Amino acid sequence: MQFDNIDSALMALKNGETIIVVDDENRENEGDLVAVTEWMNDNTINFMAKEARGLICAPVSKDIAQRLDLVQMVDDNSDIFGTQFTVSIDHVDTTTGISAYERTLTAKKLIDPSSEAKDFNRPGHLFPLVAQDKGVLARNGHTEAAVDLAKLTGAKPAGVICEIMNDDGTMAKGQDLQKFKEKHQLKMITIDDLIEYRKKLEPEIEFKAKVKMPTDFGTFDMYGFKATYTDEEIVVLTKGAIRQHENVRLHSACLTGDIFHSQRCDCGAQLESSMKYINEHGGMIIYLPQEGRGIGLLNKLRAYELIEQGYDTVTANLALGFDEDLRDYHIAAQILKYFNIEHINLLSNNPSKFEGLKQYGIDIAERIEVIVPETVHNHDYMETKKIKMGHLI
């Protein structure tokens, strides 16, 4: 498929056009027509109904939903993607509410600042969806994409979306979407590209605190940061003057290894080794909330259950439905840039960290090996990291 850049899509939306937005191939892997409510024209919903034929929905911000008392359609949402459908609506000035004209009227009234909850009949023929406050950075769905795109065009935070179906009633994917794009001369973007666009456009971290932190390995400066869009908390330990070509360790949080000294992994040993090195030579440790290579603590324990049944650390992740490594290093790169660091010496045995930082503009001048002893309990784990994940150990 041939995708367009985000800026060209924003211009098209602001001109009242409809675009195609494609989500992740591991999610729905489908394309929706998306329009911005404030800019869309009288033919937009008719085009969606005639050409796309999916369910026409109206993503809105939480503020709009709360102001108009758009309550959730069900109390117990069991949708696998957590789509926040509200009760369906028609504006009171409509008749049946189903015509393209009347659904357009209802959508436009959603963003009218003079509209009140009493101005909408329930149920109706337009289906509002409530977007997460932090948009695609919190949830990579079409709902959030539509509201984010509206905001990026300077419009009120609301859109209209419709899934694209083939003539035979199946969902359009891949080359079907490409043909639809070419037939109707539409811009087509991915939610992944929208996520990256927002990451580059907006700061993702906030500095919160700095303290002296005495430890068993020396006294460090500890900085506290908050991830703007996920509310995750990140701490950074530094020793000595901060400079270019800083010695840097990116350490993914490991409760079992770092705190309980588990011998299933080498995480705790690597952290202690890095703290000793940084205390002696100066540098920085960025402690990232990426438990279990990004799958979280409880899923890591589930992976351990599978390992006890004969899986390894990679096949266990895959069996649980995850990639072998979900970590992203954009936050780490943002923290380095906060300290005006673009060139580092990286304490790591993991090549993916090198590539992960390079894609966000961080130059790795030198790799510093982190040497820790194996134990009888983590031998197979270490071998898997070396053979299947390419770790330099």
From Swiss-Prot:
Entry's EC annotation: 4.1.99.12, 3.5.4.25
UniProt: Mg(2+) 1 binding residues: 28
Any one cellular-component term (Gene Ontology): cytosol
Cofactor: Mg(2+); Mn(2+); Zn(2+)
GO biological process: riboflavin biosynthetic process
Known catalytic reactions: D-ribulose 5-phosphate = (2S)-2-hydroxy-3-oxobutyl phosphate + formate + H(+); GTP + 4 H2O = 2,5-diamino-6-hydroxy-4-(5-phosphoribosylamino)-pyrimidine + formate + 2 phosphate + 3 H(+)
Cofactor binding note: Binds 2 divalent metal cations per subunit. Magnesium or manganese.
Protein name: Riboflavin biosynthesis protein RibBA
Binding residues annotated for Mg(2+) 2, in chain numbering: 28, 142
Binding site for Zn(2+): 254, 265, 267
Superkingdom assignment: Bacteria
